[in-house]
UniProtKB/Swiss-Prot annotation:
This is 1-(5-phosphoribosyl)-5-[(5-phosphoribosylamino)methylideneamino] imidazole-4-carboxamide isomerase. Keywords: Amino-acid biosynthesis, Cytoplasm, Histidine biosynthesis, Isomerase. It is found in: Cytoplasm. GO terms for biological process: L-histidine biosynthetic process; L-tryptophan biosynthetic process. It comes from the Bacteria. The keyword Amino-acid biosynthesis applies. InterPro entries: Aldolase_TIM, His_biosynth, HisA_bact_arch, Isoase_HisA-like, Isoase_HisA-like_bact, RibuloseP-bd_barrel. It comes from Phocaeicola vulgatus (strain ATCC 8482 / DSM 1447 / JCM 5826 / CCUG 4940 / NBRC 14291 / NCTC 11154) (Bacteroides vulgatus).
Length: 239
């Protein structure tokens, strides 16, 4: 059964969504992310993906208080990403209730530090974030495209012991146009043992079914929930 991971993206302490990572497209869905998280939990959700969008741009963790509030008021297993660039940022994330962290930019910009953290905290807690646009990895809140190609990037890090990968197709993110099933199939063909978390484009229940059929282990989704394209009741079939 595919693992369901709703996303809460945070700007100014509020639950928002963007389209293709463009901060000019932000739409506020709830002023109180804790309420959103509690509602997820009440419907049987166990996992949560929190993105500190302020942190991603500021290049240091900003919305750790929201993380702390959600972690202390729910039993959700949280992975947290956005702005984790230093040891201090990482400690802040874990101290405020994240059980896992998603690291993208640091894996590109500072591989030595990423590998140190992987060794220190283990591959259950460290998720490699691979945010892809036209087969290249993007960093710093998707504002900068690196020259790293997706498959070689994943090869390098699986050799280092990475097991969990959150792969977002930026062109699909927040667009409600369906996920890149072929992309995820390609990744799983290359790395059959990877715990791949698909992200970007989920628009309806059928999209989640398609990912499950493709044997994708987990999926992150947000906008479809917030826009009412998927209801929390719809998700019962996957519980």
């Amino acid at each position: 059964m595919i693992e369901l991971i709703p996303a809460i993206d945070i700007i100014d302490g509020k639950c928002v969504r963007l389209s293709q990572g463009d901060y000019n497209t932000q739409k506020v869905y709830n002023e109180n992310p804790v309420e959103v998280a509690k509602e997820f939990e009440a419907h049987g959700i166990h996992r949560l993906h929190i993105v500190d969008l302020d942190g991603a741009v500021s290049r240091h963790v900003v919305n750790y208080r929201v993380l702390d509030q959600i972690a202390s008021r729910t039993s959700l297993v949280i992975d947290f990403g956005g702005g984790i660039k230093t040891d201090e940022d990482l400690v802040i994330a874990f101290d405020n209730g994240a059980q896992m962290v998603t690291l993208g930019s640091v894996a590109v910009k500072n591989p030595g530090l990423f590998k140190k953290w992987l060794e220190q905290y283990g591959n259950e807690k460290i998720i490699l974030g691979a945010d892809v646009k036209e087969n290249k990895i993007s960093v710093n809140g998707w504002k900068e495209e690196s020259q790293q190609q997706l498959i070689p990037f994943l090869k390098d890090y699986t050799k280092e012991g990475v097991f969990k990968v959150l792969c977002t197709d930026i062109s699909r993110d927040g667009m409600l146009q369906g996920p890149s099933v072929e992309l995820y199939q390609q990744i799983l063909k290359e790395f059959p043992n990877m715990h791949l978390i698909a992200s970007g484009g989920v628009s309806c229940i059928q999209d989640i079914i398609d990912l499950e059929i493709a044997k994708v282990p987990a999926v992150v989704f947000g906008k479809a929930l917030y826009e009412g394209k998927i209801t929390l009741k719809d998700l019962n079939r996957f519980m």
